[in-house]
């Protein structure tokens, strides 16, 4: 494109702006703020003055900053009008060069800028001088400039070129009155001062037009009626529109001479051209008019009466007022202001057209179009930024604004000054904003095109990757149907080869598509969106590849677990086949040898196996898992039956040779027995001590080791059930168990009945709005309960018919699954609310259709009733069992479990009602208890609701709401690790004391319970937690010592001795409260091994004193003989519910495998969610599966 310069040179600022437009947005406002304010100039010389007519062209352009850029050729006739074709710096761009084709027609606009006089849709945008067809266009801005551009432009620019060629270069139409500029007027008339607008306002706020009757310009030849009316219209257009609407007050100064006739004729024409333009004419002077012009309201006034119409402060000094006015300063201000406004308006129109043009550029549909559109956009932006208006504004715009804002009283005191400057600032800021918008939009457009162009250069490589994904990658990851374990194992070899190639393909594709980071599909063209789709496909393939790799690794791990389980089962079957015809003594020895070499698989083995099978998501693999578990279970049961058969009493003395070792006399405190009992069928009584001791030794020789191996424990004499020989007692046990099994079957049928008939009702289209999506809240975890009882618990109850007391182990083994009843109880109030609001009415039709006399609410109450039934039946079994036997202890533990779950649901509801708590209660372990106490601290007494967690003791203040719902305001909490307990405090049996280590003696809390039972339960639970913490701390210290190289040998006594630590007790009454430790609690030495807090009674011989250090005997904690009721009798493998996540019921804790693992680390608690697998003796397959969740 040919540059609009005369000699080929260009402004450095213009060049910099044009070449740096893609990376920096030129802000004219910033440029103006950085410029030094222009030096104060005399008001009569604000800038290069306009030369009079007849001056040479060189004189006109001398001193103009743009004189070397734009020079208009003289007209052919060299008339005065042609001489006015060249102007000074303030108006050269307005009168001289018009916009070129691209600058004025960058997009199909409704109108375009032209050089024709009066052709403009925007006020003040016309860039013409005096009318006449002789005005010429600079060659650099002619339409022919586009013809010389070698760049092939797209359709928008072609349309621009066509429109430009059809645009006329001039027009003789008159300019609208509101678009007149100073350059459109006769300079001699404007500069003469015959008509001025000094900024005066009359008393009614009208603008005052001052006409000097004594001005010689009224007699000049240039003062034609046309020029006069143009001058008056121009002056009228300067005030604000609201002031123009009031009309002008024309003040005629006729004090020296009478006004000429042309003055009043001009006013009459002004009134005709713009009705209401002249409100009144005030004639100041003593001259009397012979004829009053028509259409004008004329009033002759003496100079003294003028103040009644115009205030003194508004009158110019020439009329005796106080308003300073200099016509030359006013002229300079108007010329510079109008030049700035013209360039801003032209630049705004240009930039708006360019923005629309960039938006109108078509999207590239073919790869070859990207380069053409990119070059077209760059040329478009280059031409826009090379436009003379932007160049002038960049070079002089800031200086012009600075000059216009100089404090010149002759100009700034006029009310029209602020209006003009506000308009100038607005237009200047608009140019700045439009340029910023255009630059950002164009840069983003060009960057997107360049990005697509870069990716097109890599098209071949990306196409190869895409083809590989479609033909090789994705088909290789697909699985035909539901895979089996063998199929997954066979796929490992081919997958390793695929994995290496796939990683290379993904890496190469990500390297190619790296420039797409941060781009969205809406910001790119269709070719770019295609590359984005390829990147998304690569990301998805990488994820699928990683999942496939993990899936095959899980399959391999699962195969190893399968192989270990099957190997264990096959070895057991082999031993059983060999012992088929052997004598009982040989059977016992061989079984002992077998369990020594092949200990039972730990529960974690089957948990991991089921987790992997569930993660693989194949029913066939899960079926294989069930088959392996069933085979192991059958083997374990066969071995157990073989052991029981071999333990039947032979004739006296016949098994003496089988005794491995003699057992010493029983200690004063006999330890608890294993979870299973081998002497239940012996039928011996306490009157047969010799035989009993002999048989105990035999059992000790045949007892199974732990899952991880280890030495065999010593046996202890057991006491057979006293009522085992009583037929009536056995009959009673059988009857109670039969009732339990029968009611269990009815309970399972009721749960299935509810699910089959009422669950589908919520899928009906007419379900009430309040019940939509409320299945989990209405029914709770009823489906999980049904699965547990139907698939597991009912079967185990039925298997206990041979020995009814074993029912207790079924409860204890599934303590985690019974935790679902606490969640069900917690959700029950919400379920009842839904039933009362919507359920009774909605489900009534279904009840009538079924012909059932029980409604849904009755069936939803059955789980709560069933737990109460369990408690009664277990109580009956305990009464029938009688005596302090192992089975009796297990039954009591099961009772405690049931009672705890019944209470725990209410405890969870109370925990949810705690408000303002800044402690995460989910991280504090199981909620054990919550009750209301009277708390005394010093002299202060208050009522507090206290919550006991495994890791925290929380105090809250009960608040009773108006609706009867209690809430609890959080007050304080203490870590259990810092707590100490004094079980008896004061004279009352209802009080106990809580104190803290490393604190002052007065920092204690005395808690008074409402009943003795509550007090005993709380002290027992707290004691249990403190014992467990003491044991845990001891183990941690031992582990730390081993890791530091201290105590690298096992701590074991070679032989029993009176000097051994375990035979000593330390009884020391502390004399100072500050030195008490957390072990100073009144608790049985082995009570920490109980399964449920507050469940077991104190053993005989327990210390009963308060704040006394008893025999901790921590070295016996891991003695297998003390683990008692940890080992279940029958294995139970949790199927689909083992590791499936349960949907939380309104924030209820879900029973997942992870929760079971966490809770299983705490073997405690009457509300414990599980048992510590490390504390389980691992007697048989699944014997520790009581901590597996069933949900």
From Swiss-Prot:
GO terms for molecular function: guanyl-nucleotide exchange factor activity. This is Puratrophin-1. One of its GO terms (cellular component) is plasma membrane. Keywords: Guanine-nucleotide releasing factor, Phosphoprotein. Residues 732-908 form the DH domain. Expressed in kidney, Leydig cells in the testis, epithelial cells in the prostate gland and Langerhans islet in the pancreas. Isoform 1 and isoform 3 are strongly expressed in Purkinje cells and to a lower extent in other neurons (at protein level). Widely expressed at low levels. More strongly expressed in testis and pancreas. One of its GO terms (biological process) is regulation of small GTPase mediated signal transduction. It holds the Pfam family RhoGEF. The gene is PLEKHG4. Residues 1159-1176 have a biased composition (Low complexity).
